A protein has these predicted regions:
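Short secondary-structure boundary segments
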Residues: 7, 54-56, 77
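Short secondary-structure capping/turn micro-motifs that flank functional sites
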Residues: 33-34, 54, 59-61
Length: 117
């Protein structure tokens, strides 16, 4: 799967996904740090990439209707630490083996993934 890692994501998470066979680009690698959410969303559409982020704005289905994207994935943890967020990336990676986030919003939380279409 083609994935875009937002600027608020630990780059070690991108490595986890790359090792699982996914094609991952980061916002930093594309010199998009500081870009507005709308710009990031448009780049993801243009590149057919699923966005992985901590930014709750992307969970707003009115602003970002999931059917218009190749996947919007928001990681949520009640006590976010680098370690706990990397665990959520691993959980997301495992889910990709059997599920497809295309045209969906996934909220990845410890032990579950909420899906909105």
């Amino acid at each position: 799967m083609k994935i875009k890692f937002d600027q608020n994501m630990d780059p070690r998470g991108a490595t986890i996904l790359k090792q699982a066979g996914h094609e991952v680009l980061t916002v930093k690698e594309q010199n998009l740090i500081g870009a507005e959410d709308e710009v990031i969303a448009k780049v993801c559409q243009d590149e057919s990439r699923c966005l992985v982020t901590l930014d709750l704005d992307f969970a707003n289905t009115i602003l970002y209707p999931p059917q218009n994207y190749f996947g919007l994935v928001v990681l949520r943890h009640p006590k976010p630490t680098a370690k706990s967020l990397l665990e959520l990336v691993r959980q997301f990676s495992a889910a990709l083996q059997s599920l497809d986030p295309t045209q969906k919003l996934w909220i990845v939380e410890p032990g579950r993934i909420r899906v909105r279409e």
